[in-house]
Swiss-Prot record:
Subcellular location: Secreted, Extracellular space, Extracellular matrix
Protein name: Spondin-1
Record domain TSP type-1: where: 437-490, 496-550, 553-606, 609-661, 663-716, 749-801
Species assigned in the record: Gallus gallus
Tagged with keyword Repeat: yes
Record keyword Cell division present: no
Domain of life: Eukaryota
InterPro entries from the UniProt entry: Reeler_dom, Reeler_sf, Spondin/Thrombospondin_T1, Spondin_N, Spondin_N_sf, TSP1_rpt, TSP1_rpt_sf, TSP1_spondin_dom
Cellular compartments per GO CC: extracellular matrix; extracellular region
Domain Reelin: 24-189
Length: 802
């Protein structure tokens, strides 16, 4: 394949116009593309193509041998420090195809970072750099082609200065085949074993970039947050999550509820495959200056068996969206540990909930779908939607940085290191690729060889980065390695003893004053002649503990690890302890402190530490008419992680419906009036008053006047009878008046005003009533005059028929 492509590139160089030092003109590129088929690989530099070096690599996340049709995979093109590249081209071809036709290409790429990568204008299926500048890593997503495509070859070309690195087999080519029934049991787990020695300790730092400024569409202002980070360092036999796989119950609870409890339980059940459980606090809100100054971090360790790390955290609120790393390999091919990993993250869907917006109601996905990265074309209501299909803006960045190495280091160097050094051209060996924006100290002297025997090892020198003037330009590593041979051969007896490395020094034998410490090594291989090894296997040296000894001194252990901070947010205290190994010789009390405490600072406390569901609809009004109350509720989706949840879970408000009907309301009936005639047949009446008029369709008022018949003595006939009745009536009135005058004289404290005039008749005909009143003028306070009260009289009027 390489032999066929080299003449193609030479023909391209020969046919084009004169080239500038750094690239082709756009016109030349267009002509070259049209002359050589649908999509030829066009390199943007001048020079001879060379085989790819091992410092450049093309990697599919998880290093799978098989792909699942339709699944998405993260593809990384990287350069090992201090190498770098300025330009690149990345394509995916069906095995055996040249790429001259559109149907030769397999699968589709998805841009992650538009500032780093773009599709080629003259070859839309290929990915290239956005701008020609120094870089050490680019990433894209590749979606596998449909069933029946067969094997696919991912190929990359690298441009560095005037030298073109191009390789069709090796580190810049990745062959991956379709998973069929025969390979269905094969997973996408990494298959390469780690050859590094000892353990390495790393710090994970998480920088959230999701904010209203970067992602304004439907941004949840009050409830935005990152859930607690959960993950582990693990072996290739355990998978926390992966693209194309199904979410476990633990992943589901992180994705939907932000709860890491079940996920941690699942991790701890894999005790043989897990070295460290990785945990970091949640962030409320998702972005603030504190998250940049003191970003959430966690430390973890890896070893030869458990050299992968995975983690995830929920982007909340959301249906089931997360970010994270899956099976990130921290072991290098040259049996070392990666110094630093920087990964930009975009959200992915756990496949357990079908919501499309941040605060969509719960809608379980049945059946459950596979984990996949979100895209800008998923749904028009999605906050990441882009009708043009652009890339999703990054929501977070994670940095993995090696902070310590422990245990034995490898006593060998891979054979290909000598080949790599010898293969470099002389001018490349001497050339310093250090950018002008990176200011270093001088190199330190070379260290002793890592091998203590007659084996191949390596030695190291270091320098210090004093200043980085341009943060966008990466600075090369501060360490340099060189192959060497160890001094482990014994010349005294003509035989060879193979020795191990020295074990770590023991603690000092005393807790005060001067003592000793020792270290050991062992014989890995005795001489063939059966003689004894004369190489020392133990070393002892003096050690001094600063504190002077006295008879009252006591022997104590080393300090233990610090306890966790007493506060989950804000300022708290942390403590560590040690124990007394031996009491003072003089029998006194040991004055050494066995507990030490100091302040610790956790992420800033926030007022919204819990995740709530959206408000429900308002209930019906509590009444059917008039004024009432209605309520709505919401649920606590996940427990508070930084304190109690003080948010209200129920709200109430007033509601108003049409006015209720008001029925007519009347007073009680009055007493019957006197008969309206002095003799013969007549009638009496009684009345009642309207207290409340009917309203809003209430019951109408019934009658307010009732009349009944009455009969007085028979009327006497003749002219003298009328005169007699009038006289009797007059005498009666005089008698009543005289009685009243006597009462007033006997009880002068009860005085009444004169009768008022009669009121107007209540009706014009048919019998009405008139009223008059006598009001009390002066009333005694004594209880024996309680009969002294206002008086009222009624009489009939307008009794003629209507």
């Amino acid at each position: 394949m390489a032999a066929r492509l080299r003449p193609l590139a030479l023909r391209l160089l020969a046919r084009t116009f004169p080239l500038v030092a750094r690239g082709f003109s756009d016109e030349t590129l267009e002509k070259a593309a049209k002359s050589e088929g649908y999509c030829s690989r066009i390199l943007r530099a001048q020079g001879t193509r060379r085989e790819g070096y091992n410092e450049f690599s093309l990697r599919v996340e998880g290093d799978p041998e098989f792909y699942k049709p339709g699944n998405s995979y993260r593809v990384t093109l990287s350069a090992a420090t201090p190498a770098y590249f300025r330009g690149f081209t990345l394509i995916a071809l069906k095995e055996g195809k040249e790429g001259d036709k559109e149907e030769d290409h397999a699968g589709t790429f998805q841009i992650i970072d538009e500032e780093e990568t773009q599709f080629m204008s003259n070859c839309p299926v290929a990915v290239t750099e956005s701008t020609p500048r120094r870089r050490t890593r680019i990433q894209v997503f590749w979606t596998a082609p449909p069933t029946g495509t067969g094997c696919v070859i991912l190929k990359a070309s690298i441009v560095q200065k005037r030298i073109i690195y191009f390789q069709d087999e090796g580190s810049l080519t990745k062959r991956i085949c379709e998973q069929d029934s025969a390979s269905e049991g094969v997973t996408d787990k990494p298959t390469l074993d780690c050859c590094a020695c000892g353990t390495a300790k790393y710090r994970l730092t998480f920088y959230g970039n999701w904010s209203e400024k970067t992602h304004p569409k439907d941004f949840p202002r009050r409830t935005n947050h990152w859930s607690a980070i959960i993950g582990s360092s693990h072996s290739k036999n355990y998978i926390l999550w992966e693209y194309g796989g199904y979410a476990s119950e633990g992943v589901k609870q992180v994705a939907e509820l932000g709860s890491p409890v079940k996920m941690e339980e699942e991790i701890r059940q894999q005790s043989d495959e897990v070295l460290t459980v990785i945990k970091a606090k949640a962030q409320w809100p998702a972005w603030q200056p504190l998250n940049v100054r003191a970003a959430p971090s966690a430390e973890f360790s890896v070893d030869r068996h458990r050299h992968l790390m995975s983690f995830l955290t929920m982007l909340g609120p959301s249906p089931d969206w997360n970010v994270g790393l899956s099976a990130e390999d921290l072991c290098t091919k040259d049996c070392g540990w990666v110094q630093k990993v920087v990964q930009d993250l975009i959200p992915w869907d756990a496949g357990t909930d079908s919501g499309v917006t941040y605060e969509s109601p719960n809608k379980p996905t049945v059946p459950q779908e596979k984990i996949r990265p979100l895209t800008s074309l998923d749904h028009p209501q999605s906050p990441f939607y882009d009708p043009e299909g652009g890339s999703i803006k990054l929501v977070a960045r994670v940095v993995l940085e090696r902070i310590a190495r422990k245990g034995e280091q490898c006593n060998f160097v891979p054979d290909n290191i000598d080949d790599i050094v010898a293969d470099l051209a002389p001018e490349e060996k001497e050339e310093d690729d250090t950018p002008e924006t990176c200011i270093y100290s001088n190199w330190s002297p070379w260290s002793a060889c890592s091998s203590s025997t007659c084996e191949k090892g390596k030695r190291m020198r270091q320098r210090m980065l004093k200043a980085q003037l341009d943060l966008s330009v990466p600075c090369p590593d501060t360490q340099d390695f060189q192959p060497c041979m160890g001094p482990g051969c014994s010349d005294e007896d003509g035989s060879t003893c193979m020795m191990s490395d020295w074990i770590t020094w023991s603690p000092c034998s005393v807790s005060c004053g001067m003592g000793t410490r020792s270290r050991e090594r062992y014989v890995k291989q005795f001489p063939e002649d059966g003689s004894m090894c004369k190489v020392p296997t133990e070393e002892t040296e003096k050690c001094i503990v600063n504190e002077e000894c006295s008879p009252s001194s006591c022997l104590v252990t080393e300090w233990g690890e610090w306890d966790e901070c007493s506060a989950s947010c804000g300022t708290g205290m942390k403590r560590r302890h040690r124990m007394i190994k031996m009491t003072p010789a003089d029998g006194s009390m040991c004055k050494a402190e066995t507990t030490e405490a100091e302040k610790c600072m956790m992420p800033e406390c926030h007022t919204i530490p819990c995740l709530l569901s959206p408000w429900s609809e308002w209930s019906d009004c509590s009444v059917t008419c008039g004024k009432g109350m209605r309520t709505r509720q919401r649920m606590l989706k996940s427990a508070a992680e930084l304190g109690d949840c003080n948010e209200e879970l129920e709200q109430a408000e007033k509601c108003m419906l049409p006015e209720c009907p008001i029925d007519c309301e009347l007073t009680e009936w009055s007493q019957w009036s006197e008969c309206n005639t002095s003799c013969g047949k007549g009638h009496m009446i009684r009345t009642r008053m309207i207290k409340i008029e009917p309203q809003f369709g209430g019951t109408a008022c019934p009658e307010t006047v009732q009349r009944t018949k009455c009969r007085v003595r028979k009327c006497l006939r003749g002219p003298g009878m009328e005169k007699r009745r009038w006289k009797e009536a007059r005498e009666k009135r005089r008698s009543e008046q005289a009685k009243k005058n006597i009462d007033n004289e006997q009880y002068p404290v009860c005085r009444l005003k004169p009768w008022t005039a009669w009121t107007e008749c209540s009706t014009l005909c048919g019998g009405g009533i008139q009223e008059r009143y006598m009001m009390v003028k002066k009333r005694s306070k004594s209880t024996q005059f309680t009969s002294c009260k206002d008086k009222k009289e009624l009489r009939a009027c307008n009794v003629h028929p209507c």
